[in-house]
């Protein structure tokens, strides 16, 4: 349902899955995503907090922290976002969460936003969207630069080879 844009139905499915297996990391992560995409940010935060606690490796902690931070940004809770981002550090192993990793390192001040955007631009469309979307959120909600955020989002939309990722939905 998430990929169809039916976020309420997706949340209902993930909630049902959690009744069956309350420690299912994937259900918690995608429940948080569903709530985030519906604009139910408080509920998204709670799902991501549980998801983070269940995260078995850096790879899982990184992607969970990224969506948690974006949720906090959209809520205007910038100090809380910086605190959450600080738990991710450059010597972690990102695995498949590389795009999330680089942007969380921007959120916590370890990496430069322009460098990360340039690196993301060299990747395929899906990985560009993954790397750039959170930086657009950061530009708008943290730096107050709505025009630059809009430029990033326009570039994401203009790279139309793949459209299956969560950044494209957000």
Regions inferred by a protein language model and the residue ranges of each:
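Register position in tetratricopeptide repeats
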Residues: 3, 37, 74, 141-142
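Structural marker of alpha-solenoid helical repeat scaffolds
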Residues: 20, 54-57, 159
